[in-house]
From Swiss-Prot:
Entry protein name: Putative GATA transcription factor 13
Keyword Nucleotide-binding: no
Keywords of the record: Activator, DNA-binding, Metal-binding, Nucleus, Transcription, Transcription regulation, Zinc, Zinc-finger
Organism of this sequence: Arabidopsis thaliana (Mouse-ear cress)
Spans annotated as Disordered: 271-291
Entry function: Transcriptional activator that specifically binds 5'-GATA-3' or 5'-GAT-3' motifs within gene promoters. May be involved in the regulation of some light-responsive genes.
Gene from which the chain derives: GATA13
GO MF entries: DNA-binding transcription factor activity; sequence-specific DNA binding; zinc ion binding
Length: 291
């Protein structure tokens, strides 16, 4: 074996010595004299340009035959290779096969059709539909809604901070508002009805002393003209059952009773004096004239 051959010697183990002699048949050699030369080189170039190369599908569909030791070996069509196999993989498969199969695999890997297939498979983009379907099934259904990116989140945070700072009240304004609220609370606590001295009422009404000076019950009585001293709501802290009442009829009855007691007391006071007693003693005696 010559050193110019780039094929390793291990691939030719088990092959006869005249294997390469049979491949290179001297009877098929063409001499240089048989080649016609002429001035019509331009015509040949024009003719070759008009030729259309055969499609790759037809070349791939053809089967190839060659002779080895007087036997005809046919190379069958193989599956298209997606990835270009390295020389180490090819030679490893050749070592583990019989001699005839070794030759077929070797020539198949070195044939121009296999080179075209490898270049076609490596250069052309593969159809990733199957891989995409598998990945889709594995990963699961994903929504079409766009995921918020980091830039959006940071922009929203900065925007919200600016808006909150713009609409947030200043410290002076907040202190003034708190002071007004405290004053209102203090005023509501200090309010007291001038008639019954109550501090809890659903609504403050106008009285003789101005606005919000009477409670709700006393204010209604004042507007109707029936607010008297004896009237007190039952919830008033100054309510006395023997003196006050929240019913107008009872107040009138109490006044009539007080008037009657006042008249009897006045009569008793007048009759209990010394002059009235002397008059009652002398009443019915005959009077003497000319004494």
């Amino acid at each position: 074996m010559n050193n110019d051959l780039w094929l390793p010697e291990e691939d030719f183990k088990g092959l006869p010595d005249n294997f390469l002699d049979n491949l290179v048949d001297p009877t098929n050699d063409v001499s240089v004299e048989d080649i016609e030369t002429g001035d019509d080189e331009g015509d040949w170039d024009a003719k070759f340009q008009k030729l259309v190369p055969p499609p790759l599908d037809e070349l791939m569909s053809l089967s190839y035959e060659f002779t080895c030791n007087g036997q005809r070996v046919q190379v069958q069509k193989h599956v298209p290779i997606l990835k270009q196999s390295s020389s180490s993989e090819v030679f490893s498969t050749v070592d583990n096969s019989p001699p005839n199969v070794k030759v077929s695999k070797l020539l198949q890997s070195l044939s121009p059709v296999s080179v075209l297939k490898n270049t076609n498979g490596s250069g052309s983009p593969q159809n990733p539909n199957g891989d995409q379907k598998l990945a889709f099934l594995v990963k699961g259904i994903r929504s079409k809604r766009k995921r918020p990116t980091l830039l959006r989140v940071t922009f929203l945070k900065s925007f919200l901070l600016e808006m909150s700072q713009q609409f947030a009240p200043d410290e002076s304004e907040s202190s003034e508002i708190s002071a007004l609220k405290k004053r209102k609370k203090n005023k509501s606590r200090r309010l007291k009805c001038t008639h019954c001295e109550t501090t809890t009422t659903p609504q403050w009404r106008e009285g003789p002393n101005g606005r919000k000076t009477l409670c709700n019950a006393c204010g209604i009585r004042f507007r109707s003209g029936r607010l008297v001293l004896e009237y007190r709501p039952a919830a008033s802290p100054t309510f006395i059952p023997t003196v006050h009442s929240n019913l107008h009829k009872k107040i009138i009855y109490m006044r009539m009773k007080d008037n009657d007691q006042f008249d009897t007391r006045k009569i008793r006071a007048e009759t209990s004096g010394p002059e009235t007693r002397s008059r009652l003693r002398n009443f019915g005696r005959p009077m003497s004239y000319g004494q």
